[in-house]
Amino acid sequence: GLPICGETCVGGSCNTPGCSCSWPVCTRN
């Protein structure tokens, strides 16, 4: 639900807990 996690997920995965990949960036729920 919240905006960008400050992480990109061009490779398809996010390392930051609670973040999911909304290509090409990670977003929080």
Swiss-Prot record:
Keywords: Disulfide bond, Knottin, Plant defense. InterPro entries: Cyclotide, Cyclotide_moebius_CS, Cyclotide_sf. Transmembrane segments: none annotated. This is Varv peptide D. Probably participates in a plant defense mechanism. The presence of a 'disulfide through disulfide knot' structurally defines this protein as a knottin. It holds the Pfam family Cyclotide. Belongs to the cyclotide family. Moebius subfamily. Disulfide bonds join C5-C19, C9-C21, C14-C26. There is a cross-link at G1-N29 (Cyclopeptide (Gly-Asn)). This is a cyclic peptide. It comes from the Eukaryota. One of its GO terms (biological process) is defense response.
